[in-house]
UniProtKB/Swiss-Prot annotation:
One of its GO terms (molecular function) is oxidoreductase activity, acting on NAD(P)H. Belongs to the zinc-containing alcohol dehydrogenase family. Monomer. Pathway: Mycotoxin biosynthesis. This is Trans-enoyl reductase eqxC. It comes from Fusarium heterosporum. It catalyses: L-serine + 7 malonyl-CoA + acetyl-CoA + 2 S-adenosyl-L-methionine + ATP + 8 NADPH + 11 H(+) = (5S)-3-[(2E,6R,8E,10E,12E)-2,6-dimethyltetradeca-2,8,10,12-tetraenoyl]-5-(hydroxymethyl)pyrrolidine-2,4-dione + AMP + 2 S-adenosyl-L-homocysteine + 7 CO2 + diphosphate + 8 NADP(+) + 8 CoA + 6 H2O.
């Protein structure tokens, strides 16, 4: 490979992000893999990479899809080869690995976190999968600890509450909950009822209906033990806490949760997770998002990526609806602002590179 420098979106000294054409292409060693980026998606987490979360010169971005360009000498366990179409979520804006991020012409990832894109999906669809399915897998099968998994379904069809079912993480969670043998109970606005049902929701409720919680309790016989909060606000946490059955259970959010709400029910165990934890490495972002290295999380990442690859291979999961824009990395900056301004609703924003 002759090219030494690349174009990427990188952190600035004043806590922002800019387009640079003189960035270093990641070095490939050990079990890492170099990927030529073909498409990226913009997520809410990208809007939060500002101020103290920015490392000057670090490449931004999490979700990508592309073609394998080079394979490290120790990347021999996952049958990843030059020319493979792959996607995943990595940790952009990483002070410990600043040359690696999704918003670049080339990026890198360890072999065991890569998802092979099946022939039925485009690069653009592949770029929308990583954060949604990685994060929900961690939430459902590690944090909540659902018995069973999509490849070995549970024998008891327990109800699992997915709050915010029409979001990208929501539709991913609904599919995984159903495949794992559970009954996905979800909430969204009435205009999205048919959408979430198409992804496998067994029952859907209007979260704005004043009788919503009582209707959920009636439908589930007051037996919800597990709740995944894809919206993760104080209000959504209060809703989930009230919907969880009398015996208590587990609640997992995708953002730091309210300690005040957590104290209202001692029989409910709260947790919150971040997708990059699955890499098993230290997350050196400011509190409360700092995490120490955790080998157990890395082991789960290996396991869960293998599960997802099997699900993709057999066409058992499908991506959230996407809206595709052209214009490359320069336009990604506009996309981040559109996500921040909530101009994109009900779809994942994807850019072709």
């Amino acid at each position: 490979m002759v090219q030494r420098q690349q174009t990427a979106l990188v952190g600035t000294h004043d806590g922002g992000i800019r387009l640079s054409s003189t960035e270093t292409i990641p070095d490939i060693a050990g079990d890492s893999v170099l990927i030529k980026t073909k498409a990226v998606s913009v997520n809410p987490v990208d809007t939060k990479m500002i101020g103290p979360y920015v490392t000057p010169g670090a490449v931004a971005g999490f979700d990508f899809a592309g073609v394998v360009e080079m394979v490290g000498p120790d990347a021999t366990k996952c049958d990843i080869r030059v020319g493979d179409r792959v996607c995943t979520a990595i940790m952009g804006m990483n002070p410990l690995d600043p040359t690696v991020g999704a918003f670049a012409e080339y990026t890198a990832a360890v072999e065991w976190i890569l998802l092979k894109i099946p022939p039925s999906l485009s690069f653009q669809e592949g770029a929308s999968l990583g954060i949604s399915f990685m994060t929900t897998g961690l939430a459902l099968f590690k944090s909540l600890g659902l018995p069973g998994n999509p490849l070995s379904p549970a024998t008891e069809k327990l109800p699992v509450l997915v709050y915010g079912g029409s979001s990208a993480t929501g539709t991913a969670a609904i599919q995984l909950v159903r495949l794992a043998g559970f009954a996905p109970i979800t909430t969204c606005s009435p205009r999205n009822f048919e959408l979430v049902k198409s992804y496998g929701a067994s029952a859907v409720f209007d979260y704005n209906d004043p009788n919503c919680i009582s209707d959920i309790k009636k439908h589930t016989k007051n037996n919800i033990r597990y709740a995944l909060d894809c919206i993760s606000t104080t209000q959504s946490m209060q809703f989930c806490y009230q919907a969880i059955g009398r015996a208590g259970g587990k609640y997992t959010a995708l953002e730091p949760y309210s300690e005040a709400v957590a104290r209202t029910r001692k029989m409910v165990k709260p947790d919150w997770i971040m997708g990059p934890q699955m890499l098993g490495k230290e997350i050196r972002w400011p509190e409360p998002h700092w995490r120490p290295a955790n080998a157990e999380m890395g082991e789960f990442g290996v396991y869960w990526t293998a599960v997802l690859n099997k699900l993709l291979e057999n066409d058992l999961i499908r991506p959230h609806a996407i809206v595709v824009r052209e214009g490359g990395l320069e336009k990604v900056l506009d996309g981040i602002e559109d996500i921040r301004a909530k101009k994109i609703s009900g779809k994942k924003l994807v850019f072709t590179l």
